[in-house]
Amino acid sequence: MVRDIVIYPNEILKKPTEKVDVIDKEVKNLIRDMFDTMYEAEGVGLAANQIGVPLSVMVIDTSPKEDAPPLKLVLINPEIKEGEGKIKYKEGCLSFPGLSVEVERFQKVKVNALNEHGEPVELTLEGFPAIVFQHELDHLKGITFVDRLKGWRRRMALEKYQKLLKSRK
C-alpha cells in the first residue's frame, strides 16, 4: 500500500527513530508499504519516519539509477561500523520535493543491520549505494540532508525549498 510521504519541516523528520525489537507482521507490512511508496515516488531509498513511522527501518533499491550497481536492501536497526574516503554528490530527497543539494559523505561504508527475517547482516557499500545508505541512516537519526550543509549553503538551500513549497500550493 502506498502511504503519504512526510514533507519537511514535519517534526517526525527531526527525531531519532526507535530500534525494532521484534520483526512481526506489522513490521513486514511496513516494509512492503515502504517499497510500494518508494517506487510510486520514483525514489531509491526510504526511511520509515518518512512515512510517519518512528522505527529504525530503511529500504533501498538502486536499480532505477542506470549508472549504479543494482542493489535491493531492507535494513533494520542499521549502523555504520566504519567509513572511508570522501565523495560529494548532488542528492535529492522525497521529503524535500524538488530540492537537490551537494552533500559530502563517506565513499565506502561497512554496515551492520538486521534483514527482514531478523538475521544479522554485514555489508560493505561503495559509491552510490553508500550515499543512499548514509542519506537514509541520517533520516533514522533525525538528520536531513540540509542539516549536513553549513552557513550560507544551508541558508540558500532552505530559502530555495521555501520557494518550491510556495510554488506547489
Curated annotation (Swiss-Prot):
Q: Name one GO biological process term.
A: translation
Q: According to its UniProt record, which cofactors does this protein need?
A: Fe(2+)
Its source organism is: Aquifex aeolicus (strain VF5)
What HAMAP family does the entry give? Pep_deformylase
Coiled coil regions, renumbered to chain = none
Q: In UniProt terms, what function does this protein have?
A: Removes the formyl group from the N-terminal Met of newly synthesized proteins. Requires at least a dipeptide for an efficient rate of reaction. N-terminal L-methionine is a prerequisite for activity but the enzyme has broad specificity at other positions.
Kindly give the Pfam families that the UniProt entry links to this protein.
Pep_deformylase
Q: Which residues form the active site?
A: 136
Name of the featured protein: Peptide deformylase
Co-factor remark: Binds 1 Fe(2+) ion.
Q: Which residues bind Fe cation?
A: 93, 135, 139
Question: Per its UniProt entry, what is the enzyme's top EC class, as one word?
Answer: hydrolase
The gene name on file is: def
This entry's Enzyme Commission designation comes to: 3.5.1.88
Molecular function terms, GO-annotated: metal ion binding; peptide deformylase activity
